[in-house]
Amino acid sequence: MMRAVQFVLAGSLSLGTVFFGGCETVPQGIQQARIEMSQHIAAEPAGDYFIGRRYFKPDYKFWGYVRRPGQPWSTAELVMLNEKQKLAPDRERLDFGSDNNYEYKLYGSFSGDKVYEPASNGIYPEFVLKGYELISTNPPPIFKSQFRGNASPTDLRYVVEKPE
């Protein structure tokens, strides 16, 4: 009987270690950055524009994430850009992907159409770009890999992250 109790106790401790070992506390600096970003987003004035974060992946054709002002990044949509009226910033400079992770104020609208992207085998909303303003070349992190800082571009080449 005593051996059975020891076995159950050891099993419970092992199981607890597995479950709680995956729990991760967020470092204080990162938590502060998230709070500041939330406050900044909440202070964005309403208007006829969107906030975009360029998300460049060499094998994919989507442009990046787009959200409405005042809304958190978790509500952003990964979009295909319609550039018939205005070229994307990196395409305008003929320096594709050079603006990865830049943040923009975007002028335009969602067309209501969906566009197939073959590399990801995904269907994304189309955003018709009419203009843009650069907000930041070094905005706060919005992806889990940026918070952790331990993933290399090679590790993430075929991973499509979602903002948090």
Residue ranges, per PLM feature:
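Bacterial N-terminal signal peptides that target proteins for export
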Residues: 1-9
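Generic anion/oxyanion-binding catalytic loop in active/binding sites
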Residues: 12
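C-terminal motif of bacterial Sec signal peptides marking the signal peptidase cleavage site
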Residues: 19-22
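OB-fold and OB-like single-stranded nucleic-acid-recognition modules
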Residues: 25-164
